[in-house]
Amino acid sequence: MRRAVCPGSFDPVTNGHLDIIGRASRLFDEVIVGVLINQSKTGLFTVDERIDMLREVVRSYDNVRVESFRGLLVDFCHAQQASVLIKGLRAVSDFDYELQMAQMNIGLAGVETLFMPTNPLYSFLSSSLVKDVAKWGGDISAHVPEVVRGALLARLDPPSRR
C-alpha cells in the first residue's frame, strides 16, 4: 500500500491545504493528515478543534484520515508505515526551508518528500493571513471551508460584527 503523510499545524485548515490533500489522495492509496502538537506554540484553535474541522472537511475522501502527532515527523511517518511526506509549495521561499527539512528527513529515517506546487489560486494563502483578515472583519469565504469560516468568526468576533 502506498501511504503518505501530509503534515502541518492547520490552524486553521485552508482551501490551499485541502487542494494539496485532495491531489495527494489521487496519488496514494492512503493519506494521513498529521496535525502537529506543538506545546511551545499557542494556536488559535486547540489540536482537537483542528482535528474536528479537518475530519469534517476531508470526510468525502475515503482514503484520507486525520491524526495528531508530537515529536519528530519521521517517527510519526514510521508509526503510520508511511514512506512519503507531502509538502505544498507556494513560492520559492517555501522551497528553501522545505528542502532543508526534506534532506534531514531522508538522512534521519529514509522518508522521502514529494513537493507539490500549490494551485495558483492559493499561492498567497496561509493560515496566518486568513486569521488576520478574519480578525479585521474581511471576507474569508473564498479561502476556507464554511465550517472553518464559522469557527473563525465565532472565535475572533471581528470589529465589524460588534
UniProtKB/Swiss-Prot annotation:
Its cofactor is Mg(2+). ATP binds at S9, F10, H17, G88, L89, R90, E98, Y122, S123, F124, L125, S126, S127, S128. It catalyses: (R)-4'-phosphopantetheine + ATP + H(+) = 3'-dephospho-CoA + diphosphate. Its EC number is 2.7.7.3. Its main location: cytoplasm. The record marks H17 as: Transition state stabilizer. GO terms for molecular function: ATP binding; pantetheine-phosphate adenylyltransferase activity. Keywords: ATP-binding, Coenzyme A biosynthesis, Cytoplasm, Magnesium, Nucleotide-binding, Nucleotidyltransferase, Transferase. Substrate binds at S9, K41, L73, K87. InterPro entries: Cyt_trans-like, PPAT, Rossmann-like_a/b/a_fold. It is found in: Cytoplasm. GO terms for cellular component: cytoplasm. Pathway: Cofactor biosynthesis; coenzyme A biosynthesis; CoA from (R)-pantothenate: step 4/5. GO terms for biological process: coenzyme A biosynthetic process. PANTHER family: PHOSPHOPANTETHEINE ADENYLYLTRANSFERASE. Homohexamer. Belongs to the bacterial CoaD family. Reversibly transfers an adenylyl group from ATP to 4'-phosphopantetheine, yielding dephospho-CoA (dPCoA) and pyrophosphate. This is Phosphopantetheine adenylyltransferase. It comes from Salinispora tropica (strain ATCC BAA-916 / DSM 44818 / JCM 13857 / NBRC 105044 / CNB-440). The lineage of its organism: Bacteria, Bacillati, Actinomycetota, Actinomycetes, Micromonosporales.
